[in-house]
Protein backbone atom coordinates (compact mmCIF):
# COMPACT_ATOMS: atom_id res chain seq x y z
CA UNK A 1 0.00 0.00 0.00
CA UNK A 2 1.39 3.38 -0.97
CA UNK A 3 1.94 6.26 1.43
CA UNK A 4 -0.68 8.78 0.33
CA UNK A 5 -1.84 12.24 1.37
CA UNK A 6 -4.18 10.57 3.88
CA UNK A 7 -1.17 9.59 6.01
CA UNK A 8 0.45 13.03 5.68
CA UNK A 9 -2.40 15.46 6.32
CA UNK A 10 -0.41 17.93 8.44
CA UNK A 11 2.25 18.19 5.77
CA UNK A 12 -0.19 19.46 3.17
CA UNK A 13 -0.75 22.72 5.05
CA UNK A 14 1.62 25.54 6.03
CA UNK A 15 2.40 26.30 9.67
CA UNK A 16 4.28 23.24 10.98
CA UNK A 17 7.37 24.18 12.97
CA UNK A 18 9.05 20.76 12.82
CA UNK A 19 8.73 17.18 11.74
CA UNK A 20 10.37 14.68 14.08
CA UNK A 21 10.59 10.99 14.96
CA UNK A 22 12.83 9.71 12.18
CA UNK A 23 16.12 11.29 13.18
CA UNK A 24 17.12 9.34 16.27
CA UNK A 25 20.70 8.20 16.57
CA UNK A 26 21.31 4.51 15.97
CA UNK A 27 23.81 1.99 17.26
CA UNK A 28 26.62 1.02 14.93
CA UNK A 29 27.60 -2.28 13.36
CA UNK A 30 28.06 -4.08 16.65
CA UNK A 31 28.20 -7.48 14.96
CA UNK A 32 31.73 -6.65 13.80
CA UNK A 33 32.91 -7.01 17.41
CA UNK A 34 31.89 -10.68 17.30
CA UNK A 35 31.91 -12.01 13.75
CA UNK A 36 34.43 -12.53 10.99
CA UNK A 37 32.83 -11.46 7.69
CA UNK A 38 33.33 -13.41 4.46
CA UNK A 39 31.67 -13.17 1.06
CA UNK A 40 29.69 -16.02 -0.47
CA UNK A 41 28.73 -16.92 -4.02
CA UNK A 42 26.40 -19.82 -3.22
CA UNK A 43 22.95 -20.28 -1.69
CA UNK A 44 24.61 -21.75 1.41
CA UNK A 45 28.07 -22.32 2.83
CA UNK A 46 29.50 -25.36 4.61
CA UNK A 47 32.63 -25.69 6.73
CA UNK A 48 33.96 -29.02 7.94
CA UNK A 49 36.01 -29.56 11.08
CA UNK A 50 38.95 -31.92 10.72
CA UNK A 51 40.42 -34.31 13.26
CA UNK A 52 44.17 -34.80 13.33
CA UNK A 53 46.21 -37.35 15.26
CA UNK A 54 46.50 -38.26 18.92
CA UNK A 55 49.64 -37.82 21.01
CA UNK A 56 52.50 -39.91 19.60
CA UNK A 57 53.14 -43.17 21.51
CA UNK A 58 56.45 -44.73 22.53
CA UNK A 59 57.83 -47.24 20.01
CA UNK A 60 59.50 -50.19 21.70
CA UNK A 61 62.66 -51.63 20.24
CA UNK A 62 61.94 -53.98 17.38
CA UNK A 63 58.20 -53.30 17.36
CA UNK A 64 56.19 -51.90 14.47
CA UNK A 65 55.44 -48.20 14.31
CA UNK A 66 51.90 -47.12 15.26
CA UNK A 67 49.68 -45.54 12.61
CA UNK A 68 46.81 -43.17 13.24
CA UNK A 69 43.91 -41.92 11.13
CA UNK A 70 42.77 -38.38 10.41
CA UNK A 71 39.13 -37.78 9.55
CA UNK A 72 36.31 -35.30 9.18
CA UNK A 73 34.56 -34.60 12.47
CA UNK A 74 31.41 -32.68 11.49
CA UNK A 75 30.12 -29.96 9.17
CA UNK A 76 28.59 -26.57 9.95
CA UNK A 77 26.13 -25.11 7.47
CA UNK A 78 25.12 -21.49 6.85
CA UNK A 79 21.82 -20.91 5.04
CA UNK A 80 21.59 -17.36 3.73
CA UNK A 81 18.41 -15.38 4.34
CA UNK A 82 16.99 -12.68 2.10
CA UNK A 83 16.12 -9.53 4.03
CA UNK A 84 14.06 -6.99 2.08
CA UNK A 85 11.67 -4.11 2.64
CA UNK A 86 10.19 -1.31 0.58
CA UNK A 87 7.74 1.56 0.53
CA UNK A 88 5.70 3.39 -2.07
CA UNK A 89 4.67 7.03 -2.42
CA UNK A 90 1.72 8.33 -4.39
CA UNK A 91 2.37 10.97 -7.00
CA UNK A 92 0.06 13.40 -5.24
CA UNK A 93 1.76 12.96 -1.85
CA UNK A 94 5.08 13.85 -3.44
CA UNK A 95 3.65 16.88 -5.23
CA UNK A 96 1.64 18.33 -2.34
CA UNK A 97 4.05 17.91 0.57
CA UNK A 98 5.15 21.39 1.66
CA UNK A 99 8.15 20.56 3.81
CA UNK A 100 10.83 18.10 2.81
CA UNK A 101 11.60 15.38 0.29
CA UNK A 102 9.46 12.36 1.11
CA UNK A 103 11.79 10.03 -0.76
CA UNK A 104 14.88 11.25 1.13
CA UNK A 105 13.05 11.04 4.44
CA UNK A 106 11.77 7.50 4.06
CA UNK A 107 14.83 6.05 2.37
CA UNK A 108 16.70 7.01 5.55
CA UNK A 109 14.01 5.26 7.59
CA UNK A 110 14.31 2.21 5.35
CA UNK A 111 18.08 2.12 5.82
CA UNK A 112 17.57 2.29 9.58
CA UNK A 113 15.18 -0.68 9.48
CA UNK A 114 17.57 -2.79 7.40
CA UNK A 115 20.50 -2.01 9.70
CA UNK A 116 18.44 -2.75 12.79
CA UNK A 117 17.37 -6.14 11.47
CA UNK A 118 20.97 -7.12 10.76
CA UNK A 119 21.99 -6.39 14.35
CA UNK A 120 19.03 -8.35 15.71
CA UNK A 121 19.93 -11.31 13.48
CA UNK A 122 23.56 -11.18 14.60
CA UNK A 123 22.72 -11.01 18.30
CA UNK A 124 20.13 -13.80 17.96
CA UNK A 125 22.94 -16.34 17.60
CA UNK A 126 24.14 -15.45 21.10
CA UNK A 127 20.65 -14.93 22.52
CA UNK A 128 19.69 -18.45 21.40
CA UNK A 129 23.09 -19.90 22.18
CA UNK A 130 21.87 -21.70 25.32
CA UNK A 131 18.51 -22.78 23.87
CA UNK A 132 17.91 -26.42 22.96
CA UNK A 133 17.17 -26.90 19.27
CA UNK A 134 19.45 -24.11 18.04
CA UNK A 135 22.26 -26.53 17.25
CA UNK A 136 25.48 -26.22 15.30
CA UNK A 137 27.45 -28.68 13.23
CA UNK A 138 28.41 -30.84 16.21
CA UNK A 139 24.76 -31.35 17.13
CA UNK A 140 24.76 -29.19 20.26
CA UNK A 141 23.98 -25.58 21.10
CA UNK A 142 26.64 -22.91 20.66
CA UNK A 143 27.23 -22.79 24.42
CA UNK A 144 27.39 -26.29 25.86
CA UNK A 145 29.28 -28.41 28.36
CA UNK A 146 29.17 -31.38 25.97
CA UNK A 147 30.86 -30.50 22.69
CA UNK A 148 31.86 -34.09 21.91
CA UNK A 149 35.26 -34.95 20.44
CA UNK A 150 36.40 -37.69 18.07
CA UNK A 151 38.57 -38.95 20.92
CA UNK A 152 35.47 -39.54 23.03
CA UNK A 153 36.01 -36.60 25.38
CA UNK A 154 34.24 -33.25 25.49
CA UNK A 155 34.98 -29.54 25.47
CA UNK A 156 32.90 -27.09 27.47
CA UNK A 157 32.53 -23.41 26.62
CA UNK A 158 30.26 -22.63 29.57
CA UNK A 159 31.01 -22.42 33.30
CA UNK A 160 30.31 -25.54 35.35
CA UNK A 161 27.61 -23.52 37.11
CA UNK A 162 25.96 -20.55 35.35
CA UNK A 163 27.64 -17.51 36.88
CA UNK A 164 27.14 -13.77 36.89
CA UNK A 165 29.99 -11.61 35.62
CA UNK A 166 32.52 -11.05 38.40
CA UNK A 167 36.23 -11.43 39.06
CA UNK A 168 36.01 -15.11 40.01
CA UNK A 169 33.84 -16.17 37.07
CA UNK A 170 35.96 -14.24 34.56
CA UNK A 171 39.23 -15.68 35.88
CA UNK A 172 37.70 -19.17 35.80
CA UNK A 173 36.69 -18.64 32.17
CA UNK A 174 40.25 -17.64 31.22
CA UNK A 175 41.58 -20.80 32.85
CA UNK A 176 38.90 -23.01 31.29
CA UNK A 177 39.59 -21.68 27.80
CA UNK A 178 43.31 -22.45 28.20
CA UNK A 179 42.44 -26.12 28.81
CA UNK A 180 40.46 -26.70 25.61
CA UNK A 181 41.67 -29.46 23.30
CA UNK A 182 41.34 -30.44 19.66
CA UNK A 183 39.35 -33.43 18.42
CA UNK A 184 42.09 -35.81 19.57
CA UNK A 185 42.45 -34.24 23.03
CA UNK A 186 45.64 -32.27 22.33
CA UNK A 187 45.76 -28.86 24.04
CA UNK A 188 45.20 -26.00 21.57
CA UNK A 189 46.55 -22.98 23.52
CA UNK A 190 43.32 -21.02 23.18
CA UNK A 191 43.02 -17.54 24.68
CA UNK A 192 40.20 -15.04 25.21
CA UNK A 193 40.20 -11.89 23.11
CA UNK A 194 37.23 -9.72 24.03
CA UNK A 195 34.44 -9.56 26.60
CA UNK A 196 30.98 -8.95 25.11
CA UNK A 197 28.28 -7.70 27.47
CA UNK A 198 24.75 -6.25 27.40
CA UNK A 199 24.30 -2.62 28.47
CA UNK A 200 23.41 -3.66 32.03
CA UNK A 201 26.92 -5.07 32.58
CA UNK A 202 29.00 -2.29 31.03
CA UNK A 203 30.02 -0.78 34.36
CA UNK A 204 30.88 -4.18 35.82
CA UNK A 205 33.06 -4.82 32.76
CA UNK A 206 34.82 -1.47 33.18
CA UNK A 207 35.65 -2.14 36.82
CA UNK A 208 36.86 -5.68 36.11
CA UNK A 209 39.11 -4.83 33.17
CA UNK A 210 40.27 -1.26 33.70
CA UNK A 211 40.95 -0.76 37.41
CA UNK A 212 44.50 -1.18 38.71
CA UNK A 213 43.58 -3.00 41.94
CA UNK A 214 41.17 -5.83 42.69
CA UNK A 215 37.50 -4.95 42.58
CA UNK A 216 35.32 -5.04 45.70
CA UNK A 217 37.98 -6.04 48.24
CA UNK A 218 39.82 -4.37 51.11
CA UNK A 219 43.11 -5.84 49.92
CA UNK A 220 45.77 -3.98 48.00
CA UNK A 221 46.23 -6.77 45.44
CA UNK A 222 46.74 -5.94 41.80
CA UNK A 223 43.97 -6.57 39.29
CA UNK A 224 45.40 -9.77 37.80
CA UNK A 225 43.06 -9.68 34.79
CA UNK A 226 44.37 -6.25 33.80
CA UNK A 227 47.99 -6.89 34.80
CA UNK A 228 48.19 -10.14 32.81
CA UNK A 229 46.38 -8.76 29.77
CA UNK A 230 43.98 -11.69 30.04
CA UNK A 231 41.33 -9.97 27.89
CA UNK A 232 43.59 -8.08 25.47
CA UNK A 233 40.84 -6.40 23.42
CA UNK A 234 38.85 -5.16 26.41
CA UNK A 235 35.09 -5.27 26.23
CA UNK A 236 32.32 -4.39 23.79
CA UNK A 237 28.70 -3.55 24.53
CA UNK A 238 26.05 -5.21 22.39
CA UNK A 239 22.72 -3.45 22.74
CA UNK A 240 20.81 -6.27 21.04
CA UNK A 241 21.51 -8.92 23.67
CA UNK A 242 18.25 -9.78 25.41
CA UNK A 243 19.51 -11.29 28.68
CA UNK A 244 20.83 -8.62 31.03
CA UNK A 245 22.86 -11.20 32.98
CA UNK A 246 24.48 -13.11 30.12
CA UNK A 247 28.08 -12.38 29.15
CA UNK A 248 30.43 -13.74 26.51
CA UNK A 249 34.07 -13.98 25.51
CA UNK A 250 35.38 -14.13 21.96
CA UNK A 251 38.52 -16.25 21.62
CA UNK A 252 41.43 -16.56 19.21
CA UNK A 253 40.24 -19.96 17.97
CA UNK A 254 39.97 -19.62 14.16
CA UNK A 255 36.79 -20.24 12.16
CA UNK A 256 34.49 -19.52 15.08
CA UNK A 257 31.76 -16.91 14.61
CA UNK A 258 31.05 -16.26 10.92
CA UNK A 259 28.99 -13.73 8.97
CA UNK A 260 28.57 -14.58 5.29
CA UNK A 261 27.54 -11.80 2.92
CA UNK A 262 25.83 -13.32 -0.12
CA UNK A 263 24.45 -10.09 -1.60
CA UNK A 264 25.47 -6.69 -0.20
CA UNK A 265 22.79 -4.13 0.56
CA UNK A 266 21.13 -2.97 -2.66
CA UNK A 267 18.76 -0.02 -3.04
CA UNK A 268 16.51 0.53 -6.04
CA UNK A 269 13.43 2.43 -7.14
CA UNK A 270 10.97 2.50 -10.00
CA UNK A 271 7.81 4.29 -11.03
CA UNK A 272 4.45 2.79 -11.92
CA UNK A 273 3.17 4.24 -15.21
CA UNK A 274 -0.53 3.67 -14.48
CA UNK A 275 -0.74 4.99 -10.90
CA UNK A 276 2.21 7.37 -10.84
CA UNK A 277 3.33 5.79 -7.58
CA UNK A 278 7.07 5.62 -6.92
CA UNK A 279 8.40 2.51 -5.20
CA UNK A 280 11.63 2.12 -3.27
CA UNK A 281 13.19 -1.04 -1.89
CA UNK A 282 16.24 -2.33 -0.07
CA UNK A 283 17.45 -5.91 -0.21
CA UNK A 284 20.39 -7.97 1.03
CA UNK A 285 21.25 -11.62 1.69
CA UNK A 286 23.40 -12.88 4.52
CA UNK A 287 23.77 -15.41 7.30
CA UNK A 288 25.16 -15.44 10.83
CA UNK A 289 26.36 -18.52 12.69
CA UNK A 290 29.35 -20.43 13.91
CA UNK A 291 31.65 -23.16 12.71
CA UNK A 292 33.90 -23.97 15.68
CA UNK A 293 31.98 -23.32 18.93
CA UNK A 294 35.30 -22.75 20.67
CA UNK A 295 35.33 -19.34 19.01
CA UNK A 296 33.10 -18.20 21.90
CA UNK A 297 32.63 -18.76 25.61
CA UNK A 298 29.35 -17.84 27.25
CA UNK A 299 27.57 -17.71 30.59
CA UNK A 300 23.83 -17.23 30.92
CA UNK A 301 24.32 -15.64 34.34
CA UNK A 302 23.26 -17.04 37.67
Question: Each predicted region: which residue ranges?
Answer:
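A generic local secondary-structure boundary/capping motif
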Residues: 75, 183-185
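Generic structural "secondary-structure junction" signal
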Residues: 80, 96, 128, 136, ...
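N-terminal alpha-helical "arm" segments
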Residues: 1-27
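Assembly/oligomerization interface modules of large self-assembling protein complexes
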Residues: 25-83
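Long, contiguous amphipathic alpha-helices that act as assembly "spine/axial" helices in icosahedral shell
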Residues: 75-133, 195, 280-282
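Sequence/fold signature of self-assembling virion shell proteins
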Residues: 2-10, 143-182, 189-194, 200-302
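Glycine-rich, mobile lid/loop segments that gate access to catalytic sites or pores
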Residues: 118-154
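Short, contiguous, pocket-lining structural segments
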Residues: 79, 102, 106, 162-165, ...
Amino acid sequence: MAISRAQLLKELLPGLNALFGLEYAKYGEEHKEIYETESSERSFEEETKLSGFSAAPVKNEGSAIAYDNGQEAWTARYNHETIAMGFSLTEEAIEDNLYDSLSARYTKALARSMAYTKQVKAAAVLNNGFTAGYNGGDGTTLFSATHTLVSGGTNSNVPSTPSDLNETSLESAVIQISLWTDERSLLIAAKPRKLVVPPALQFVATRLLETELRVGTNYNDINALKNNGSIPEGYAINHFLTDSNAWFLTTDVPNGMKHFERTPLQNSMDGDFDTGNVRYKSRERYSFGWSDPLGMYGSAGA
